[in-house]
Amino acid sequence: MRGIRFLLVGGIAAFALSTPALAQQYPSKPITVIVPFAAGGPTDVVARLVGERMGRALGQTLIVENIGGAGGTLGMTRAVQAAPDGYTIAIGNMGTQSAAPSLYPNLRYDPAKSFAQVGIVNYTPQAVVSKKALPTTNLKDFIAYVKSKGTGVSYGHAGVGSISHVAGLVFNAQFGLTPNLIPYRGTGPVLQDMVAGNIDYTVDQSLNVIPQIKAGTIKSYAVAAPERLSSIPDVPTTKEAGVDFIFSAWNAMVAPKDTPKDIVEKLVAALNTALDDPAVKARYAELGSSAPQGADRGPAGLQKLVDSEVARITPVIKAAGVKVE
């Protein structure tokens, strides 16, 4: 027993001594970044952009691994189960980190407690858009029109639990709208049907709808942001349109719970370096996105955002009775 006790205590001591050493050497090999959505989507685009710059700051390659399914929760569950050594991190979004607990009764992670928060990666405001044939020209008239039509108007979204689904629930609830909700498999088909005149409207990330707005194939009423976007400067903000509605999608970087603090701090520093990079800022502007600033950066800023978004979104989802079994 004495020998076993000695080995056990010695092993614990060795682990305790090795943890700081591992943190000092970190990273000594490539880092896997789990993106819980398909390649080419908004989260994937941002992950690759920021990951490349973070890799330069850290002196190692960040390798994106796309693990889609179950509204992004499959990939985030994989991240929770990874070793807390800093070599597997993930980029979730508003859906996986705020809406998921209300949508998935059997969710295998708690966004507020199951991760070591690294930081907010970007914000992308929602844009209110419709098919060209809708007989409205401004946001107030649009809301009044949709309200008057009830379920005779269709709302297209990218699937249950998607950003456009959640944003639509919040928007529709705030203004008393009761459209017929039509789920699609992704944003692309929604916009294709909108251009074809088969879907009346959606509230989606500006990143997704900027090409159609510029091409003039859909109507744009407003962006739900405090300021206009430089990529679509003619589209007013919701405030300018006389409507009180601010809503941004966001992406966030997390690591498995119990990742050493020193390693998290290195990831935070690398993320901030990436967000301050002029090339990243320029690309964000093209995408209609922006980086967090000041106190919104880092683990505390992300934790505050997750907590506030869960509080905002949960009542709306529960009232709508939406569940994913």
Would you name each region that the model predicts?
Residues 7-18:
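Bacterial N-terminal signal peptides
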Residues 81-87, 102-189, 240-243, 250-283:
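Hinge/capping helix and adjacent helix->loop/strand transition within the periplasmic-binding protein
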Residues 1-5:
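Positively charged n-region of N-terminal signal peptides that target proteins for export
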Residues 110-120, 178-182, 200-201, 210-246, ...:
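Short beta-strand->loop
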Residues 23-113, 152, 176-205, 212, ...:
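N-terminal (or domain-start) structured segment
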Residues 28-30, 261-325:
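An extracytoplasmic/periplasmic, membrane-proximal ligand-sensing/linker region
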